[in-house]
Amino acid sequence: MKTKNVNLLFALVAVLLFGFSCFCISRMNQTNNQLINCRNHVLEFKETMLRLKNKSENNHQNLVKVLHQLKHKVAPAKPSGSILEKKVNMLDQDETVFNQFEVLKFFLPHLRTAGNIYPDIAIGRQRAGVSFALGITTIDRGNHTYLKQTLTSVLSRMTPEEEEDSVVIVSVADTDENYLKSVVHMVKTRFRKQVQSGALEVISIPALFYPQTLLEKKTTKNAKNWQIKQVLDFCILMLYAQPKATYYLQLEDDIVAKKMYFTKMKDFVNSVTSKDWFYIEFSVLGFIGKLFRSKDLMDFVHFFLIFYRAKPIDVLLDDIALLRMCSFGGPLRSCLQLKREVRVQYKPSLFQHVGTHSSFPGREQHLKDHYY
């Protein structure tokens, strides 16, 4: 009996050991499969990371190449002992002018099926070959307008000789025809002499220049579109002004100028000792009072159009100055020093911002140039 019990015990232990062995073998197989799957995932992850790394390196090389090209696209200007580095000749063919605007078709696909594109000229004698073109963009601000005050300040503080050697261009960047009519009427009534002499022009930008989304009614939800359209407004005005003068001065429709601002500006440009200044600031606010060589305007416009949806134009201007002078990965301190050499500042500022009602409906701004 005792032997029988021992045999049963051995049999039970054997069964238990067999079951445990089967369980262990099963778990080992599962673990092995999991390890194999894990290893496959790790290998797949490594391959993915390697592809991403290679792609990133390629993108980085391409980006550096593009930035390098942009950086050296605008050649340093040669020094000149005269205020006039080069007089721009009168345009002989309309085709020459139209080509200025063909660049828009590369960045704005909706224009690629259009024919010749050019702003509408509401008032103007097509003056060219002058030293300075002064550009002012304007849109309807509802019941608030500063344009007449701005034009009075800008034009009345020129000498007759300075007025003869310049052209002020007002660009109406508003699709409301009534606003265009009001601007034309005001200009013809208040500044008849300058209109007749060709010192003052008014152009209008047709709606077809803009992507349709930028023409939607302005709301707080699409405030970004207002900023985007503003960049295009400036670019179009720059393209129009580029063949007219040696220098281009950017103003806005809600500023006033200091007495003798034009004389001071002209004398300062002639006295700048830097051989390769990029642009000169006659105001520290935004895009107001920025002076460019007209021959450089196309390069600025190219850069602005590449990033016109990304940032306001004054920020893009700061970016291109950094790009112009700073090496990729170079020290920030030396970069900022080089930037100051190409972005020349004139103090005290020659222009002051006076508008409080923004061109964006319902928005107020109380920006002042403290160096004015």
From Swiss-Prot:
Domain of life, per lineage: Eukaryota
Tissue specificity field: Testis.
GO BP field: cell differentiation; negative regulation of protein glycosylation; protein N-linked glycosylation; spermatogenesis
Record topology, Cytoplasmic segments: 1-8
An example Gene Ontology molecular-function term: acetylglucosaminyltransferase activity
Record's keyword annotation contains Transmembrane helix: yes
Location, primary (coarse class): Golgi
Places the protein is found: Golgi apparatus membrane; Endoplasmic reticulum membrane
Post-translation changes: N-glycosylated. O-glycosylated; further modified with terminal sialic acid residues.
Topology of this chain in the membrane: Single-pass type II membrane protein
GO CC term, one of those recorded: membrane
UniProt keyword terms in alphabetical order: Differentiation, Endoplasmic reticulum, Glycoprotein, Golgi apparatus, Membrane, Signal-anchor, Spermatogenesis, Transmembrane, Transmembrane helix
Residue ranges, Lumenal side: 30-372
InterPro entries cross-referenced by the UniProt entry: Glyco_transf_54
Ranges that cross the membrane: 9-29
Functional summary from the UniProt entry: May play a role in male spermatogenesis. In vitro acts as inhibitor of MGAT1 activity causing cell surface proteins to carry mainly high mannose N-glycans. The function is mediated by its lumenal domain and occurs specifically in the Golgi. A catalytic glucosyltransferase activity is not detected. May be involved in regulation of Sertoli-germ cell interactions during specific stages of spermatogenesis.
Family membership: Belongs to the glycosyltransferase 54 family.
Protein name: Alpha-1,3-mannosyl-glycoprotein 4-beta-N-acetylglucosaminyltransferase-like protein MGAT4D
Organism: Rattus norvegicus
Gene name tied to this protein: Mgat4d
